[in-house]
């Protein structure tokens, strides 16, 4: 593992990187316009030149920011490196939210390993939920 680099998402990342990652994991990708800033409202962590993971943050009209849509490169096989990169990702997204004026960071996650990562950077479990409900308008 080289040094980890955090950079903002750019215009090309959704089509050229993230769509492939969602496909690798067998997940349905969110529509680009469902994501903050049309798919650019987040950051990516790279190991040198290799993209490892990315995530998004929604800033709201309250003091709450939503840190979510964490996705990683399934072909990046350094498990320890992936764990470190995802922790850096969640921490970086949370810090951007704080610098943007949010007082609380919120996330909806189901994956136990990811829940542990969020806890490692200071999140605590709230209520559990059964289903996400979305309605296109």
Label each region the model flagged.
Residues 1-31:
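Short amphipathic alpha-helix that is part of the acyltransferase structural core
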Residues 79-95:
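Conserved acetyl-CoA-binding loop-helix of GNAT-fold acetyltransferases
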Residues 108, 124-137:
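Conserved catalytic-core motifs of GNAT/GCN5-like acyltransferases
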Residues 63-81, 131:
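Conserved acetyl-CoA binding element of GNAT-fold acetyltransferases
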Residues 32-44, 53:
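A short helix-loop-beta-strand connector motif used in the catalytic cores of GNAT acetyltransferases and
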Residues 117-123:
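Conserved active-site tyrosine of GNAT-family acetyltransferases
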Residues 49-59, 65-68:
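Conserved beta-strand in the GNAT
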Residues 105-116:
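Conserved beta-strand-loop-alpha-helix junction that forms the acyl-donor binding cleft
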